[in-house]
Protein backbone atom coordinates (compact mmCIF):
# COMPACT_ATOMS: atom_id res chain seq x y z
CA UNK A 1 0.00 0.00 0.00
CA UNK A 2 2.78 2.44 0.93
CA UNK A 3 4.53 1.65 -2.35
CA UNK A 4 1.38 2.49 -4.33
CA UNK A 5 0.97 5.80 -2.53
CA UNK A 6 4.62 6.65 -3.12
CA UNK A 7 4.35 5.76 -6.81
CA UNK A 8 1.21 7.88 -7.25
CA UNK A 9 2.90 10.77 -5.46
CA UNK A 10 5.97 10.57 -7.72
CA UNK A 11 3.81 10.49 -10.85
CA UNK A 12 1.85 13.54 -9.70
CA UNK A 13 5.04 15.44 -8.88
CA UNK A 14 6.43 14.56 -12.32
CA UNK A 15 3.27 15.81 -14.06
CA UNK A 16 3.38 19.02 -12.05
CA UNK A 17 6.96 19.49 -13.21
CA UNK A 18 5.85 19.34 -16.83
CA UNK A 19 3.69 22.43 -16.30
CA UNK A 20 6.60 24.28 -14.69
CA UNK A 21 8.52 24.19 -17.97
CA UNK A 22 7.68 27.09 -20.25
CA UNK A 23 8.59 27.29 -23.92
CA UNK A 24 8.06 30.46 -25.94
CA UNK A 25 5.98 29.95 -29.09
CA UNK A 26 7.47 30.24 -32.57
CA UNK A 27 5.09 32.04 -34.97
CA UNK A 28 4.92 31.84 -38.76
CA UNK A 29 2.43 33.83 -40.86
CA UNK A 30 2.02 32.88 -44.51
CA UNK A 31 -0.57 32.61 -47.28
CA UNK A 32 -1.64 29.29 -48.77
CA UNK A 33 -1.12 30.51 -52.34
CA UNK A 34 1.18 33.20 -53.75
CA UNK A 35 -0.65 36.49 -53.13
CA UNK A 36 -2.42 38.38 -55.89
CA UNK A 37 -4.19 41.64 -55.09
CA UNK A 38 -7.96 41.20 -55.21
CA UNK A 39 -7.80 37.39 -55.40
CA UNK A 40 -9.20 35.37 -52.42
CA UNK A 41 -6.60 33.36 -50.49
CA UNK A 42 -6.09 31.71 -47.09
CA UNK A 43 -3.92 33.31 -44.39
CA UNK A 44 -2.23 30.89 -41.96
CA UNK A 45 -0.75 31.48 -38.53
CA UNK A 46 1.27 28.43 -37.48
CA UNK A 47 2.29 28.50 -33.81
CA UNK A 48 4.75 25.86 -32.60
CA UNK A 49 7.08 24.79 -29.78
CA UNK A 50 5.07 26.25 -26.87
CA UNK A 51 4.38 24.96 -23.37
CA UNK A 52 2.09 25.03 -21.37
CA UNK A 53 -0.73 24.38 -23.83
CA UNK A 54 -2.97 27.37 -22.98
CA UNK A 55 -2.55 29.99 -25.72
CA UNK A 56 -4.55 32.84 -27.26
CA UNK A 57 -4.26 33.54 -30.99
CA UNK A 58 -5.80 36.44 -32.88
CA UNK A 59 -5.50 37.23 -36.57
CA UNK A 60 -5.56 40.92 -37.46
CA UNK A 61 -6.39 43.02 -40.50
CA UNK A 62 -5.07 46.58 -40.26
CA UNK A 63 -4.67 46.10 -36.49
CA UNK A 64 -8.27 44.93 -35.91
CA UNK A 65 -9.31 41.42 -34.93
CA UNK A 66 -10.60 39.26 -37.78
CA UNK A 67 -13.81 37.66 -36.46
CA UNK A 68 -13.97 34.48 -38.56
CA UNK A 69 -10.82 32.49 -37.76
CA UNK A 70 -10.70 28.70 -37.69
CA UNK A 71 -8.30 26.69 -35.51
CA UNK A 72 -6.91 23.21 -35.99
CA UNK A 73 -6.88 20.79 -33.10
CA UNK A 74 -3.91 21.36 -30.81
CA UNK A 75 -1.25 18.66 -31.09
CA UNK A 76 2.01 17.92 -29.32
CA UNK A 77 5.50 16.96 -30.41
CA UNK A 78 7.87 14.33 -29.05
CA UNK A 79 9.34 16.90 -26.65
CA UNK A 80 5.83 17.64 -25.24
CA UNK A 81 5.72 21.09 -26.80
CA UNK A 82 2.49 22.00 -28.57
CA UNK A 83 1.52 23.34 -32.00
CA UNK A 84 -1.64 24.70 -33.61
CA UNK A 85 -2.71 26.31 -36.89
CA UNK A 86 -5.08 29.29 -37.13
CA UNK A 87 -6.36 30.25 -40.57
CA UNK A 88 -8.84 32.55 -42.25
CA UNK A 89 -9.98 33.56 -45.71
CA UNK A 90 -8.65 36.91 -46.91
CA UNK A 91 -8.29 38.94 -50.07
CA UNK A 92 -4.96 40.77 -50.15
CA UNK A 93 -4.67 44.35 -51.36
CA UNK A 94 -1.70 46.65 -51.77
CA UNK A 95 -2.56 48.68 -48.64
CA UNK A 96 -3.99 46.20 -46.10
CA UNK A 97 -1.72 44.70 -43.42
CA UNK A 98 -2.29 41.28 -41.85
CA UNK A 99 -0.81 39.85 -38.68
CA UNK A 100 -1.07 37.17 -36.04
CA UNK A 101 -1.01 38.13 -32.34
CA UNK A 102 -0.15 35.45 -29.78
CA UNK A 103 -0.52 35.65 -26.01
CA UNK A 104 1.19 32.96 -23.91
CA UNK A 105 2.34 32.52 -20.31
CA UNK A 106 5.99 32.36 -21.42
CA UNK A 107 5.88 35.94 -22.76
CA UNK A 108 5.56 39.17 -20.76
CA UNK A 109 3.35 40.69 -23.46
CA UNK A 110 1.64 39.42 -26.63
CA UNK A 111 3.78 39.04 -29.73
CA UNK A 112 2.56 40.22 -33.13
CA UNK A 113 4.04 38.81 -36.34
CA UNK A 114 3.12 40.48 -39.63
CA UNK A 115 2.45 38.70 -42.90
CA UNK A 116 5.18 39.40 -45.45
CA UNK A 117 3.66 38.94 -48.89
CA UNK A 118 7.14 38.42 -50.37
CA UNK A 119 7.91 35.34 -48.27
From Swiss-Prot:
InterPro entries: B2Microglobulin (IPR015707), Ig-like_dom (IPR007110), Ig-like_dom_sf (IPR036179), Ig-like_fold (IPR013783), Ig/MHC_CS (IPR003006), Ig_C1-set (IPR003597), MHC/Immunoglobulin (IPR050160). GO terms for molecular function: protein homodimerization activity; structural molecule activity. Residues 1-20 form the signal peptide. The keyword Signal applies. Transmembrane segments: none annotated. GO terms for biological process: amyloid fibril formation; antigen processing and presentation of endogenous peptide antigen via MHC class I; antigen processing and presentation of exogenous protein antigen via MHC class Ib, TAP-dependent; cellular defense response; cellular response to iron(III) ion; cellular response to nicotine; intracellular iron ion homeostasis; iron ion transport. Residues 25-114 form the Ig-like C1-type domain. Keywords: Disulfide bond, Immunity, Immunoglobulin domain, MHC I, Secreted, Signal. Disulfide bonds join 45-100. The keyword Iron-sulfur does not apply. It is found in: Secreted. It comes from the Eukaryota. GO terms for cellular component: cytosol; external side of plasma membrane; extracellular space; Golgi apparatus; HFE-transferrin receptor complex; MHC class I peptide loading complex; MHC class I protein complex; phagocytic vesicle membrane. Heterodimer of an alpha chain and a beta chain. Beta-2-microglobulin is the beta-chain of major histocompatibility complex class I molecules. Forms a heterotrimer with MR1 and a metabolite antigen. Belongs to the beta-2-microglobulin family. Component of the class I major histocompatibility complex (MHC). Involved in the presentation of peptide antigens to the immune system. This is Beta-2-microglobulin. It comes from Mus musculus. The gene is B2m.
Amino acid sequence: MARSVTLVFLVLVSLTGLYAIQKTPQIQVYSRHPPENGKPNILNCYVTQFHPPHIEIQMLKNGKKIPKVEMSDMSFSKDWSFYILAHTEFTPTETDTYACRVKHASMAEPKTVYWDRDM
